[in-house]
């Protein structure tokens, strides 16, 4: 398994001294007795966009959910190994999962606005986190960052459910930005959107990637190539009982993954020969 930011990679990336935001060390995830993903070790660079690609069932979303402990909410799920965020293993017993989720936000595949006004969707997180500043200012800033302000500034009290699918997804991104995270996780954020809405989300991602660490799971390899700086390729493998589990095959700069990958599996996947 290859990672350009690992200590032993010998990669040109090492000389650039990219700051690491999140590091996994031998991270494995189980659902009951079933091994879902095995021993993933990688370093996610700060203020860059990293894409996770691979066939269905390879563990992309499972690993993504480890980064803000959303797997804790799945009955029977357990994690082995560690996820290091700012020098601390977020799975240590003294770590508050709610604080992890504030600092590491998640945008889901399907837009899921609350059945509240546009304004209250954005203000909800800051309110429950005890935000003491100007809420109006915070709401406007989050909507501007999500490139939605000009479209909704005159209807903030309208239901968020009245927005189009693409607008709802940008609202969900704005809602995440309002809690002032350091990392934004996105699990197939364009899967249910039309091509025009997808393009707007991709343009937004490129803009946000200058200020936030973003990790995106996508089945769309063209999208990964367009928006990401780094790409991790995951695949499945059969254990001795014939049961599939996921693993990371290769992690490198996106240009390298798509143009000259080090692993044959990666080359076959990105060229469309399997998957």
UniProtKB/Swiss-Prot annotation:
One Pfam family from the record: ABC_tran
Record the organism. Synechococcus sp. (strain JA-3-3Ab)
Name of the molecule in the record: Phosphate import ATP-binding protein PstB 1
**Keywords on this record?**
ATP-binding, Cell inner membrane, Cell membrane, Membrane, Nucleotide-binding, Phosphate transport, Translocase, Transport
Q: Which CDD domains match?
A: ABC_PstB_phosphate_transporter (cd03260)
Q: PANTHER family recorded for this chain? A: ABC TRANSPORTER I FAMILY MEMBER 17
Q: Where is the ABC transporter domain?
A: 22-261
Quote the EC number. 7.3.2.1
Asked if the keyword 4Fe-4S belongs to this entry, the reply reads no
Q: According to its UniProt entry, what is the function of this protein?
A: Part of the ABC transporter complex PstSACB involved in phosphate import. Responsible for energy coupling to the transport system.
Question: Its principal location?
Answer: membrane
Topological category with respect to the lipid bilayer = Peripheral membrane protein
What family is this protein classified in? Belongs to the ABC transporter superfamily. Phosphate importer (TC 3.A.1.7) family.
